[in-house]
Amino acid sequence: MNYYSIQNSRDSSISSIEIRICSSKSIVKKSSRILPNGNIVGEIKTAQTMNYKTLKPENSGLFCEQTFGPIKDFECACGKKYENEFIGFCAICGIEYASSQVRRNRLGYIKLVSPVVHIWYLKYISILLDIPLKSIESIVYSTDGIIFKNFFQKPKKNQILKKETFEITENLNNTYFKDSINLKYSLHVQKNIISYLKNLKQAVFILKTKQDQQLKYNFSYLYYTLNNFYSLSYSFQWEAKKQWNTIIWFFKYKQRMKENFIKIDPLQKKLNDEYFEKTFLFGTSILYCWLKYFDYNFQLLNLERQIRFTVFEIKEEIKELSGILFSYFFQKQQFISFQKKIKKLNWKKNKVFRRLKLIMYFRQAKLQPKWMILSSLPVLPPDLRPIVELGSNKIAVSDLNKSYQTIILRNLRLKKFYNNSAFNEFTEEIRYTKRLLQESVDELIQQDKSKKNNNISSKSLSDILKGKRGRFRQNLLGKRVDYSGRSVIIVDPELKLHECGIPLKMAIELFYPFIIQYLISFNLTKTIPGAKHIIHTKASFLNEIIHFVLNNYLVLLNRAPTLHKLGIQAFKPKLVTGKAIKLHPLVCPAFNADFDGDQMGMHIPLSFESRAESWKLLWSRNNLLLSSMGSPILTPGQDVVLGCYYLTSNLLDKVKTYIKPCHLNKKGENWSIYFNNLNDVLKAYNQNKVNIHTEIWIKWSENIMFENNSLDLRRLEVYSGKFFRFQYENYQINYNLKGYQLSQYIKTTVGRVIFNSLLY
C-alpha cells in the first residue's frame, strides 16, 4: 500500500509530501503501538465489529478501542474518565485515555498467512520479470501452476562425467546454494563449463491450461526470460561482460509458514525419482521468491547494465537491417519480410525500454520490488469507514467493513488449512482459498469491472478516491460553499461589458438572507417566516426588492480551470428570464469560454474587504489587458466578426429577397427611401418596415469624407421653382435657386445604422 512520508514537520506544518511504495514491515511498524503495560496492539485478528448486545467494539476487531482509541473523549470502555495525568490508560480494559479524534488517523493491520499481490502493481511485476501479464495472473490467482523440472540429475551408469563438473552441477541445484558453493568456483567460471551447463540443463516452465496441456520449452528458448535475473550470490562474478546474458537459474526454498515453498534438495536420496523430477508450484509465493532477489544496490544495477547492452544490440540490428532494406527496394517479397523484422525489433526495443525505465525508477527511489507483494494489509481508521445508526432499528455499514471482514475470514480459513496436516501446498482446497484471499484483497483495493456491471453497489478504495465524486475532487479540492451557484452560460450582446444576467430563481437562492433583511427593513413583514412566505408566493413587489438588492452587490464569475487571474472576474448582476447565466461575448476570451454548454460558478463576496477588492481589482471593466503581455484581452471572436460582416454588408444588388413589395413602384423599380435621422431608421426596423440590408438615404448634417471615385456626378435634378439636386453614387446635395446648400443625404443600409448606433 502507499503511505505519506512527511518530512520536516514542525508545529504541524507540512513542508513536503511524498507518495511511494511501503514495505510490509513499515506497515506493521506504523500500525502497531506499545501500551504502557507492554502489550503490543494493532493487529486485527477477528472479523467482528460491534457486540450486538452491548453495542460496544469487540477486542482485536475492526473497531477495537485498544487499537484505534476510545469512542468517547478521554473515557475508557469501563466508563472511567481521565483524572490522573500520570496514568494514561485503563488498567482493566487497556484502553488509552485520549481524544476520540485519534480514531480518524490510527491504522491497524491484518497479518496475511499467504502473501498477495497489490492489484495496482500487477502490470509492473509483469514488466519487471518480463513474463506475460496473463501468465502472472494465472500464477497469482492459482488457476495455473509451474512445473519445475530439476536441471541436474545424478549421472547414470551410461553417462560419464568428470568429478569437477558433477560437483558444480550438484552445488548449483543445492538448497543452500550460497553456502555450499566453493570459492574456486565462485570467483571464475570456465567458459567451456558454462557452455556445457547451458547445453545440459533443460527447464520446463509450464502453465497448466484448463485442458491440462503441458508445453515444454528448452532452456535455450527460455533463455531471454530466465536470464533476466541476477539471482546469484554477491561473491559470484562473471569472467567477461559478454557473459551477462548467461545467468544460472536456481531456487532456494524454505519450509516456513511465511513462505510456503517446497524444499528441493537434490542431495536428499530419500525422495523417489518421480517426485524429484517434477515439482508443482502455485500462488504468489513464487513471485515473492523471484522478486526478493532484486536488490536496488546490486542486482538491479547489473540488470540495468544487461538491458542497456540488449538495447544496444537491438539498435545495431535495426541499423543493419535498415541498410539492407534499401538494397531490396525493388524486390517486393524481401522488402516486406525485412520490414516485418524491423517492426518486430522496434516493438521489442520499446518493450525493453519500458522495463529499463521501471528498473531505473526502483534504483533511484531505493525501493525493493518485493514490496509490491503484501504480507501485511493495512486497515483504515474506523471513523473513515463508520457504522451509522439511521433510527427505527436500522444501521448503515460502510462497504469497506464488509471487504475487511471477507479478507479476515478467508485468511483464518487458510491458516486453519495450513495447521491441518491433512492438507499440503498442492491440495485443491488451499489453492482455491488462496485465490479467494487474493480476490478479496483486489475487491478492497479496486473492484472488478465485471462486478460493477452486475449492479453491485459496494465501493472499493479506488472508487472512494477517484473520479468526480471521489474524496479528492469532491471533498478536498471541490468543496461546496454557501452563497454560490452554477449554471450554463449563454450569450447576450445587449448586456454591458461589466454586466451579467442572473436568472430569477438563482437570484432568490443566492440573495435569500439579504432579501429577507430588506423585506423586514421596509416594514413589508415583521418576522422571518413571513418574509419566507412572501418569497415563496412570489409577490408582485418581490422583483423590485430583488432589483434593489442586486444594485448594491457584485457577483464573482469563475470558470474552471482557473489558469490565471482573469479566470475570476466581478460583474454587476442583472435580473433576466430563463435558467442560464447571460454573458457579454467580449469577456469570454479571458475565461477561455464559449457557448457550447460551458458552465460557470457564481459567488457572492460577503466581507467588506472582499467587496472592496471586487470593485477595485476584479471588476471586468478594469481587466482589459493581459497581465503577461499587455495585449488587449477583449478581442472579438469569430461569431462577433461574422455578425458584424453580416450586419454591414450590402446584399441588395445580389439578393432580391431583401426588397419589400411596398418599396417597388409601378414599373417594378426600387423606390428611394429617405429618413430624417437615425432614430426614424431604428423605429422603421423595429416595426418590420425595412430589413437589415435595405438601402436607404438618410439626412446627415455632419462633415462627410468620400473617396475620389465616389464623387463622379451621376445626374442633376432640377425641381421647378424650388431647388435643384446634385446626385452622386452614395451622396446627394440639395441647393436652393440662390445657390445655398439646403441639405445633404448619404446612402447606407439599415444594418450599418444599427452598427453605428452601437458604437456611438
Curated annotation (Swiss-Prot):
Give GO terms for biological process. DNA-templated transcription
Checking Pfam families in the record gives: RNA_pol_Rpb1_1, RNA_pol_Rpb1_2, RNA_pol_Rpb1_3
GO-annotated molecular function: DNA binding; DNA-directed RNA polymerase activity; magnesium ion binding; zinc ion binding
Q: Which reaction does this enzyme catalyse, per its entry?
A: RNA(n) + a ribonucleoside 5'-triphosphate = RNA(n+1) + diphosphate
Q: Where does Zn(2+) bind?
A: C76, C78, C90, C93
In the Enzyme Commission scheme, what number(s) does this protein have?
2.7.7.6
Spell out the SMART domains in the cross-references: RPOLA_N
Note accompanying the cofactor annotation:
Binds 1 Mg(2+) ion per subunit.
SUPFAM superfamilies given in the database record: beta and beta-prime subunits of DNA dependent RNA-polymerase
Which InterPro entries does this UniProt record tie to the protein?
A: DNA-dir_RpoC_beta_prime, RNA_pol_asu, RNA_pol_N, RNA_pol_Rpb1_1, RNA_pol_Rpb1_3, RNA_pol_Rpb1_3_sf, RNA_pol_Rpb1_clamp_domain, RNApol_RpoC1
The answer to whether the entry has keyword Nucleotide-binding is no
Q: Where in the cell is it found?
A: Plastid, Chloroplast
Q: Which keywords does this chain's UniProt record carry?
A: Chloroplast, DNA-directed RNA polymerase, Magnesium, Metal-binding, Nucleotidyltransferase, Plastid, Transcription, Transferase, Zinc
Which cofactor does the UniProt annotation name? Mg(2+); Zn(2+)
Top-rank taxon of the source lineage equals Eukaryota
Amino-acid positions noted as binding Mg(2+) in the UniProt annotation, renumbered to this chain: D594, D596, D598
State whether it acts alone or in a complex, and with which partners, per the record.
In plastids the minimal PEP RNA polymerase catalytic core is composed of four subunits: alpha, beta, beta', and beta''. When a (nuclear-encoded) sigma factor is associated with the core the holoenzyme is formed, which can initiate transcription.
The record ties this protein, via PANTHER family, to: DNA-DIRECTED RNA POLYMERASE, DNA-DIRECTED RNA POLYMERASE SUBUNIT BETA
Q: Which family does it belong to?
A: Belongs to the RNA polymerase beta' chain family. RpoC1 subfamily.
Biological role stated in the UniProt entry: DNA-dependent RNA polymerase catalyzes the transcription of DNA into RNA using the four ribonucleoside triphosphates as substrates.
What is this protein's record name?
DNA-directed RNA polymerase subunit beta'
